[in-house]
Amino acid sequence: MQITDNKYYISEIFESIQGEGNFAGVYSLFIRFHFCNLTCSWCDTKYTWFEKSGAFKEYSAEELKSIIRNSKPYHIIFTGGEPVLYRLDKLTVEGKKFHVETNATIIPTTKIDIQQGAKTRFSRKAMDTRIISTFNWVVASKLSNSNQKLNEEAILYWAKQQFCIYKFIIQSLTDLDEIEQFIQKFGILKQKVYIGLEGVTTESQIRGTLVDAIINRGYNFSPRLQVLLWGNERGR
């Protein structure tokens, strides 16, 4: 399967509220892109990249733009999977605010040619900086608890951008030490960092000791509203 500039594979499209980050609570249209270049051990959307996970649908840019244009929400959220595998700059329409959730391993303004497993290849041109700089980017760089390797070149790119915030998901207090080292290494301001708690149950999100530690270190706490309200239900 060859995925190029004019092909978009989508796992699901739905309306809900943004659950995390600097726009938590806003009414949004979510477009969840299929495929990811990572395989994080605790991923809560494995159906977007696990080969036997089920169906996805192919769209053209014009088909997705029509859905976006006719949707009720003002906020449009590209999530995944990994949206940056695709030409997101070709999906904009007037009168909407676009958000992207990325794993921080791919630079959007460079051309990519990535082999994904044995059957899938991503080949897209560089995105237009003028367009993507109008997006609200949520850069979710992975910690060691994901068992994934950092792409330092990509992180250095994101550290220079003014149009993004950083989101981390932690399991324990030791993860905060790793975040501290990360932001010092790449020169990231604490006020741009939002930290949430790993897990897909209500109980996993109500851990006062961890929340106290997050705010005592000067970070923003990011509640994961979708987990608190609906657990791990799809389409939420």
Q: Where in the sequence are the language-model features?
A:
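Conserved AdoMet/S-adenosylmethionine-binding subsite of the radical SAM
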Residues: 84-236
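A generic structural micro-feature
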Residues: 23-25
